[in-house]
Amino acid sequence: MEPTTAQEQLPAPEQLPAPEANAPKRDPENGDAAADHQAQEPPSKKARLDDSADSNGQTADAPAPRMKGVAPIKPEFIIDQQPTRGQTASDANADDAAEAAHHDGRADEQNGKKKKKKTGQNTNRTFGRSEDAKGLCSSVNFRPEFSPAECTFGEKCRYEHDLRTYLKEHKREDLTTFNGMCPVWDVHGKCFVGWKCRFVGSHSEERETADGRKELVLIEDEERKKKVQRLVPFAGEDGAVNVASMEDKIALARRKMDFPRAGPYSAWLENTSRTIEKELHKRHRAAPVGAETKDGESKDAESKDADSKDEKEENRAMYVEPPFMPSEKRRLYFGPETPALAPLTTQGNMPFRRLCVELGAQFTYSEMAMSLPLIQGNKSEWALMRAHESEMLPPTMLPGADIVQGYDNSKDMKFGAQIAANKPWQAFKATEALAKVTPNLRVIDLNCGCPIDLVFKDGAGSALLEHPSKLEKIIRGMNTVSDQIPITVKIRMGTKDNNPNALKLTERLLLGGYETSLLHHDGAAGAAAITLHGRSRQQRYTRQADWEYISECAALIKRLNEKTDAVTDTIREPDARTQPNGGKVYFLGNGDCYSHVDYDNHINNAGVDAVMLGRGPLIKPWLFEEIQAGQYLDKSATERLAMIEKFCKYGLEAWGSDEHGVGTTRRFLMEWLSFTRRYVPIGLLEHLPPYINDRPPAFRGRNELETLLASANYKDWLKISEMFLGPAHKDFKFEPKHKSNSYDEAEG
């Protein structure tokens, strides 16, 4: 069990030391034994593998052999501590074991009674409500005290209209963090939540009117507003892009939005597939009994090839062409210098992605959105498509990079959307809606890897791996209706450990299956890139990702890319619109990348074009910096705390600095802290490189703050949040996603 700290009063953020300064000291009255071991925090260190460890990854001062599955922490930092009240279950419980206990739906029985499970997910989690005692009417919120707008609800309005009453009785006192300055107003020169802001005192004042009365007014700083420089011209004044308008969401909810491509294509696919299926079944039933020779051998190869060719010709004459062809797509590029941040459920929010982009992430993805709620205009689902303007900038490329013909880096961007669907028509309509409502997307990625039972049993996510024909149809249809946005797909090795099918599925996506060869002149399904997570759905995180299997898939895609012309149907020249990314399909590997050593090994030995990172950046978001620098970065505790502070500022910009926005920021911060606390500083390790699945014994950090950041106690996470977001609302609640702080569902 990792240690928890005493519940002492921590210093305010403005009192925290600089990254190079001493760490805050614990109050001696608390009697914390860790204070006796207090060490001055070292500055951030850059350690190359060659400098810090010998060739087998063992440091010179570490004679003890490395134990599998256990983080090799130096003995002087290991402590023996019993679990304390309020602490979460030990990390000795494997992540997937906790989830398996939940999904299995069975519990051990003793004396005829079910034992209460101590592991598994905290289902039906609630976070309470962070809101004012009584809300302020929108007719007042952005107006001077004596000049409110007319309330459309009149006397029936249930919100407060008296500004001073609201500020005095219904709104909590202003926060004093960030020196009492509203982070949003400090950056933009105006606050986007008006009088509801928890820092409203920093951008409001009382002015005397002509009749001698005192009037409360909001202030905007024109100088700050002039300094704001939008990174892209289509960003909103808050720096957000891909914001679905209320009109579009209402049109979707009321089924008023037209789908001129998805509708006809879905109807064509349904009719044609039904005809194909009927014809195939009829031919199977009509197969002659004497088709085999006396020796049991089948007909000779030439005869079979001739029959197959005749059959294809007959089908092409019989079946109607699709109502339209795909639009030519923007060209993509993935390379060794472009590490990608994986789509992450809950954790892949805009503030976290923005932080990762600053630290070197070249590609980001939205959280997985379900297609049906998107089509229905669901507000929360469309909110997942919001991106920061920094995600609209082109990726960094090395000079001389091997790019496909027609690729224009200046028109490229970092952010893509990921969706899940269990029916082709849902995927088609969601794709067309995204292309129409949020056109600033690098790609639209189809999730075929999500292992969550709720998604799998609905036929989406990794369930599509068991239905390759259906998956291929979805990719083809998405590619047809997505306008200029390329389509990509993320898959797993398979659903079962003993039956990986990613190789066959990859080949099908590049060459096309038998059924679709009867409908299409060209083989490729249209996926511009394929990402393979080197685990099965059944495996979850019980073992390391299988990079040997990923390497096999990479080799297959390389061979097929090189022989595209040879395997393409030669009846006619392939239409450029049907060729994904100019004929080249990129391949990304995903799984367990936790250091620049892992990244370089995968690039050089697995043959992937790039690596997608999921859990690694959640634990240490500066992993992108390490990859770029080619060395370990031993971040100090105060440097890590500065990242947390930056996340809080970005959260207030994204969700608002009012009571609701502060509560939302706190919730997602604590979700993230449940990952960051797993980080073991490089300076504490005996062996390198670190492994993401290694579990540390209870340890203390090099100073009090480092120990606090490693705490497994969610109450300590709340304490960290209060350093920047002030005391939590009385109704705020937080329950860790897993009782053992598992993180199996973070990445699909």
Swiss-Prot record:
InterPro entries: Aldolase_TIM, DUS-like_FMN-bd, tRNA_hU_synthase_CS, Znf_CCCH
Positions of the UniProt region annotated as Disordered: 1-130, 279-314
Pfam families linked to this entry: Dus
GO BP: mRNA processing
Required cofactor names: FMN
Keyword annotations: Cytoplasm, Flavoprotein, FMN, Metal-binding, mRNA processing, NAD, NADP, Nucleus, Oxidoreductase, Repeat, tRNA processing, Zinc, Zinc-finger
Chief place where the protein resides: cytoplasm
Recorded family membership: Belongs to the Dus family. Dus3 subfamily.
Protein name in UniProt: tRNA-dihydrouridine(47) synthase [NAD(P)(+)]
Organism: Aspergillus niger (strain ATCC MYA-4892 / CBS 513.88 / FGSC A1513)
